[in-house]
Amino acid sequence: MASYLDFEKNIQQIDEDIINAQIKGDTEAVSILKKNLEKEISKTYKNLSDFQRLQLARHPDRPYALDYIELILNDAHEIHGDRAFRDDPAIVCFMGYLGEKKIIVIGEQKGRGTKDKIARNFGMPHPEGYRKALRVARLAEKFQIPILFLIDTPGAYPGIGAEERGQSEAIARNLYELSDLKIPTIAIVIGEGGSGGALAIGVADKLVMMKNSVFSVISPEGCAAILWNDPAKSEAATKAMKVTADDLKSQGLIDDVIDEPTNGAHRNKEAAAVAIADYVKKSLNELENIDVRELSANRMQKILKLGAYQEA
């Protein structure tokens, strides 16, 4: 059953009316309702607020990494384990073909359904997850296979066990190692880009975001709790933090924004997957014509520009 956000209630009502009309066999009513649905979808998604985009980034029906992997990869084979502690299901790694091009995809997976969410720790990787990602990235470099990173996490797991096993070291190590990989890399924020948990697989030649994704150093709820001692002010925090794809593009923090279907990726996963696949193919064609040493140098320059400021 489809899930609906508060601002999608009109869409939900029309969807239900369509189902009822189909059950009754009223084809004329179905045709009229579908036209009304298209108008309502266009109206609803035309001028979304920052907070509504945050809600869409977290939408329970939004496609996750495994959904995109299934839709865009052919002959996909999963790679498990960090070869040191265990396999972290919050990070998924696959080798396969994007069209005729061999590629490795490394993504953060939140999970669907209670059991899967718990197994994948709600998309919050442990240090062994980031070490698995790094192991696979090194494997990709060894065999000269480009990497696609799919970012979707509320953040790295902050539990005691994760800290004891070196969470901060694992993230820092990934930042260091991924910045110098001698292969083309692309990172796409497909949902939530939560702080260091996102950065740990977000160092790439191209860092891009889906239109209805977000990227921030802390959740708006956390920001509101710290600044105003009131998590309920998360809507104001979302606007103040500039977390949307358009905001980050205007600040030069990301390279591109991938448009989603008019009704959002959660209502048309296939179209969203096509948009990602097309962007990745085009970008890899560009990046593969650049010397790998130049790619590495350019990547480092991008990192050094982050956080620059001018004194008034």
From Swiss-Prot:
Q: Where does the protein end up?
A: Cytoplasm
Alphabetical list of Pfam families matching this protein: ACCA
Spell out the reaction equation it catalyses.
Answer: N(6)-carboxybiotinyl-L-lysyl-[protein] + acetyl-CoA = N(6)-biotinyl-L-lysyl-[protein] + malonyl-CoA
**One biological process GO term for this chain?**
malonyl-CoA biosynthetic process
Q: Under which EC number(s) is this enzyme classified?
A: 2.1.3.15
State any GO CC term: acetyl-CoA carboxylase complex
- Main location, first listed in the record: cytoplasm
Please list the disulfide bridges. none
Please state every residue range assigned to the domain named CoA carboxyltransferase C-terminal: 36-286
Q: Keyword check for Transferase, yes or no.
A: yes
Q: Which InterPro entries match?
A: Acetyl_CoA_COase_a_su, ClpP/crotonase-like_dom_sf, COA_CT_C
Give GO terms: molecular function aspect only: acetyl-CoA carboxylase activity; ATP binding; carboxyl- or carbamoyltransferase activity
Task: Give the EC class as a word.
Answer: transferase
Q: How does it assemble?
A: Acetyl-CoA carboxylase is a heterohexamer composed of biotin carboxyl carrier protein (AccB), biotin carboxylase (AccC) and two subunits each of ACCase subunit alpha (AccA) and ACCase subunit beta (AccD).
Q: Family, per the entry?
A: Belongs to the AccA family.
Q: What is this protein called?
A: Acetyl-coenzyme A carboxylase carboxyl transferase subunit alpha
What does the organism's lineage look like at the top? Bacteria, Pseudomonadati, Campylobacterota, Epsilonproteobacteria, Campylobacterales
